[in-house]
Amino acid sequence: MTDNSKTRVVVGMSGGVDSSVTALLLKEQGYDVIGVFMKNWDDTDEFGVCTATEDYKDVAAVADQIDIPYYSVNFEKEYWDRVFEYFLAEYRAGRTPNPDVMCNKEIKFKAFLDYAMTLGADYVATGHYAQVVRDEDGIVHMLRGADNNKDQTYFLSQLSQEQLQKTMFPLGHLQKPEVREIAERAGLATAKKKDSTGICFIGEKNFKEFLSQYLPAQKGRMMTIDGRDMGEHNGLMYYTIGQRGGMGIGGQKGGDNAPWFVVGKDLSKNILYVGQGFHHESLMSTSLDASMIHFTRDMPEEFEMECTAKFRYRQPDSKVTVKVKGDKSEVIFAEPQRAITPGQAVVFYDGQECLGGGIIDQAYKDGKVCQYI
């Protein structure tokens, strides 16, 4: 049996069940475990209650139960500079960003990893549903989590080989119900705590209200592709490509009484385009351009590959051809895709392995730009 007692693992603990079980499993495997709670956002609500305080109490309770030391570290400045400013800039540009991808890259596996190293960590661990496997050459491959419904490799796709070399995902081989069961069996304080939803820093708040505190909304016209005026929109940033509802035009007829969807945006003219039908022709595209292209291991500067891709979380994989040039790439779809959204991540897979990904800049239909920003 391996003696793990000399290997120090610093666990990012959020006060949720996943990170609690992560710490428990590592402790049971004999590692030298330290828990760290990251405070990334000042989330005091209108009643003066800070949810982070409640979460930290849960971290403390679990750490005491499993007998590990724990600390709290404040990354509010790093989060603001590296994640939130990016988030706002993307919305200003008419795009729909994915802050979780950036949060993992810049905070959970950079700021936190650096901090863990000052505590003498050999590895960091989180409660993400993903797996890491080291090959005979010492290269770490990131594989999907065993629980298909919970697999989080989409959000981890910007991690580097250096980051993965120092990372453990103890829940990767488990199904979510098994994780709850382990927590309940061990009597952990967080065993019955519900999973958090929403963007990491907004939590359960009203998204529209939250965004309007930072970006003034500019109302404008809402139109069909053929120029019919459908009324007023509340601000382009509140709408995402492919969105159904929320436009206030549900009762308006046309087409075959099909529901209305957001099918395009024109940032320069401040126009929101809407159309009827889930598969409206303006929502379909055949290729995309992406930037911030990144792979989890060394790849040539310029190459072409066939693989599968996801264009949003929990979506089935689609076959694609990827042409990479530096940190940019063209991704050509084997079948037309719906609602490819600038600002979202495109993530590449080879079977179970997550190869990396990039951020979608523009979608095209047969070589012609889709009016999505």
Swiss-Prot record:
ATP binds at residues 12-19, 38, 127. Keywords: ATP-binding, Cytoplasm, Disulfide bond, Nucleotide-binding, RNA-binding, Transferase, tRNA processing, tRNA-binding. One of its GO terms (biological process) is tRNA wobble position uridine thiolation. Disulfide bonds join 103-200. It catalyses: S-sulfanyl-L-cysteinyl-[protein] + uridine(34) in tRNA + AH2 + ATP = 2-thiouridine(34) in tRNA + L-cysteinyl-[protein] + A + AMP + diphosphate + H(+). It is found in: Cytoplasm. CDD domains: MnmA_TRMU-like. Its EC number is 2.8.1.13. GO terms for molecular function: ATP binding; tRNA binding; tRNA-uridine 2-sulfurtransferase activity. The keyword tRNA processing applies. Residues 150-152, 312-313 are annotated as: Interaction with tRNA. The active site is at residues 103, 200. Residues 98-100 are annotated as: Interaction with target base in tRNA. One of its GO terms (cellular component) is cytoplasm. The record marks 128, 344 as: Interaction with tRNA. Catalyzes the 2-thiolation of uridine at the wobble position (U34) of tRNA, leading to the formation of s(2)U34. Belongs to the MnmA/TRMU family. This is tRNA-specific 2-thiouridylase MnmA.
